[in-house]
């Protein structure tokens, strides 16, 4: 399968929505979205999933295309693994209405992971016909079907107080990433299905201080991440 077999224009891409920072997230930049002070009310007493936020390129895959968050087809050199090594093997398992979103870790961004077993980690699946984000259990099931990992899960359950949550986050942020070195942050979502209109009250993130955004200088000097067990 070559890149010419990928139809980049046949479907209008559905980009991954921006995620608000928790009110006290230290890594928020001036143009990032931030939650209100009472943001935790949307999550208190509800079943949630907290995942490690990996430092890569947000990428969407359908059964006919793959593209970056900006809706630009993945033609850059650090997306070669998506086009060549992943897309051909998963496209027939994705329905016409589904978009699989994940973190492309082929290129080192600001964190150099040293225990990666895959360059692509799934974190969400959207159904354009039903207009719903799949529940986390369905995302995990979908990942098994595609034989791809999800982003690491830190917690599943109910947290009743913001203090309890922050104690957990502070502990997790003091521990290494599942793939060595430091964590970029965490993402917390309601475990069930999420409608687009409920997005801002259903998912939130916490990002480490001094998080470095990629820019033109990074594009000129990027390097490939190492895998400990490259299955492709």
Task: Please give the residue ranges for each predicted region.
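Core nucleotide-handling region used for phosphoryl-transfer chemistry
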Residues: 2-232
């Amino acid at each position: 399968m070559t890149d010419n077999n990928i139809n980049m224009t046949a479907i209008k891409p559905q980009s991954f929505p921006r995620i608000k920072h928790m009110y006290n997230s230290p890594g928020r930049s001036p143009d990032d979205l931030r939650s209100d002070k009472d943001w935790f009310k949307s999550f208190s007493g509800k079943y949630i999933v907290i995942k490690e936020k990996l430092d890569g390129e947000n990428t969407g895959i359908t059964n006919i295309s793959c593209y970056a968050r900006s809706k630009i087809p993945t033609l850059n050199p650090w997306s070669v693994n998506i086009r060549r090594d992943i897309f051909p093997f998963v496209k027939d398992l994705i329905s016409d209405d589904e978009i699989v979103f994940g973190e492309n870790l082929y290129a080192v961004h600001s964190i150099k992971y040293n225990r990666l077993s895959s360059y692509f980690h799934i974190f969400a699946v959207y159904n354009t016909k039903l207009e719903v984000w799949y529940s986390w259990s369905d995302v995990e099931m979908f990942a098994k079907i595609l034989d791809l990992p999800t982003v690491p899960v830190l917690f599943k359950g109910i947290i009743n107080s913001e203090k309890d949550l922050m104690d957990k986050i502070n502990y997790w942020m003091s521990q290494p990433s599942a793939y060595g070195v430091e964590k970029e942050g965490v993402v917390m979502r309601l475990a069930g299905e999420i409608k687009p209109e409920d997005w801002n009250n259903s998912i939130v993130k916490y990002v480490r201080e001094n998080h470095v955004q990629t820019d033109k200088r990074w594009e000129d000097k990027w390097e490939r991440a190492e895998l400990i067990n490259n299955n492709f």
